[in-house]
């Protein structure tokens, strides 16, 4: 399995519904095993082995204490494990399929966290895949479940369905028109959470936001996904209206901004992660507005992923100081955009 190589996961390659705005959808199910305290370090490795036995050769097991710090960071940048697992889960592990659209974290905050990712706004497809895996596990192992409270989890906010549905969106139109603050306030008033690209603990940046449900108790899985889908449909509509307004009323200023960012990335020799991310966001907007017919959405995803620190260290084959990282980032970006 080439998970540590510079390639996109399937959910970043394939197209999906509303993928001019929605980058990806994710469903995560948190589960714990009955009669096992969660989590207890002395028991953790045995739990990993017990759960791993449930899965066939379509999944590959990676134990956190058997892979390098760089490899862990690569998995985080590909959204296949959480930053928490990389930093704190000494006895954790992850099961991955070849397409990298299913990630099953073992001994993170819970014994088992099933993640399924899809391109675009396809939450129901991700839910179906996650529930299928969940059912397969439950045929072999017994979950910690309470008739009143539902699935029992290490964090009380996950009790009930144990489901976290999230959607990653690119909202440069709402950011530029300064409507993003009111939109986020409206989202939060409906009981949803807005975070950055790496979820809990990360802040939104470069017009990329992650929207997820907060309530897991008192609603069914289908109701949670339906509610989030309806909210996302409203956000998508507002973002498209904002983009149209920008193109119609501020066309030359918008075009200048987008092409300046393109010129920067095509010609820079030193660039920071934040400066690159902002320019990539501008170019992605330009792609969606038809300014760059030769640049695909897949290429935009390559720019985002392969300009991250761990992938740059992988490219260089060594650790780097801050300046070296900026130089390698500029080189990688130029190569992706075609300036070889």
UniProtKB/Swiss-Prot annotation:
Positions of ATP binding: 24-28, 79, 113, 164-168, 195-200
Alphabetized Pfam families for the sequence: ATP-gua_Ptrans (PF00217)
One Gene Ontology term of the molecular function aspect: creatine kinase activity
GO cellular component, one term: extracellular space
TM region positions: none
Catalytic activity entry: L-arginyl-[protein] + ATP = N(omega)-phospho-L-arginyl-[protein] + ADP + H(+)
Domain Phosphagen kinase C-terminal: start-end pairs: 21-242
Keywords on record: ATP-binding, Kinase, Nucleotide-binding, Transferase
InterPro entries per UniProt: Arg_Kinase, ATP-guanido_PTrfase, ATP-guanido_PTrfase_cat, Gln_synth/guanido_kin_cat_dom
EC number: 2.7.14.1
CDD domains tied to this protein: bacterial_phosphagen_kinase
Gene Ontology terms: biological process: phosphocreatine biosynthetic process
Highest taxon, organism lineage: Bacteria
Function: Catalyzes the specific phosphorylation of arginine residues in proteins.
Family, similarity comment: Belongs to the ATP:guanido phosphotransferase family.
HAMAP family listed in its UniProt record: Prot_Arg_kinase (MF_00602)
Protein name per Swiss-Prot or TrEMBL: Protein-arginine kinase
Gene responsible for this protein: mcsB
């Amino acid at each position: 399995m080439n998970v540590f190589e510079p390639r996109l996961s399937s959910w970043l390659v394939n197209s999906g519904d509303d993928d001019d705005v929605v980058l990806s959808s994710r469903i995560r199910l948190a589960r714990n095993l009955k009669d096992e305290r969660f989590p207890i370090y002395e028991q953790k490795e045995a739990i990993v082995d017990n759960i791993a036995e449930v899965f066939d050769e379509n999944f590959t097991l990676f134990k956190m204490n058997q892979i390098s710090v760089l490899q862990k960071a690569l998995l985080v940048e590909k959204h296949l494990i959480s930053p928490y697992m990389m930093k704190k889960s000494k006895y954790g592990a992850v099961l991955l399929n070849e397409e990298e659209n299913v990630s099953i974290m073992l001994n993170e905050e819970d014994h088992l966290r099933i993640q399924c990712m899809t391109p675009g706004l396809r939450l129901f497809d991700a839910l179906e895949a996650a529930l299928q895996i969940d059912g397969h596990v439950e045929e072999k192992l017994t979950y910690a479940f309470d008739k009143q409270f539902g699935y029992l989890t290490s964090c009380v906010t996950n009790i009930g369905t144990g489901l976290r549905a999230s959607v990653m969106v690119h909202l440069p139109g709402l950011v530029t028109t300064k409507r993003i603050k009111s939109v986020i306030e409206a989202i939060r008033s409906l009981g949803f959470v807005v975070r950055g690209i790496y979820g809990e603990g990360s802040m939104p940046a470069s017009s990329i936001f992650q929207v997820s449900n907060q309530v897991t108790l008192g609603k069914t899985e289908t109701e949670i996904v339906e509610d989030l889908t309806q909210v996302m449909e409203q956000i998508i509509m507002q973002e498209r209206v904002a983009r149209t307004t920008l193109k119609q009323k501020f066309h030359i200023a918008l075009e200048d901004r987008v092409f300046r960012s393109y010129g920067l990335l095509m010609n820079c020799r030193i660039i920071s992660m934040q400066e690159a991310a902002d320019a990539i966001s501008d170019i992605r907007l330009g792609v969606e507005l038809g300014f760059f017919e030769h640049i695909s959405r897949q290429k935009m995803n390559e720019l985002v992923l392969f300009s991250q620190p761990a992938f740059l260290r992988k490219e260089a084959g060594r650790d780097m100081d801050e300046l070296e990282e900026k130089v390698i980032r500029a080189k990688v970006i130029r190569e992706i955009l075609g300036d070889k």
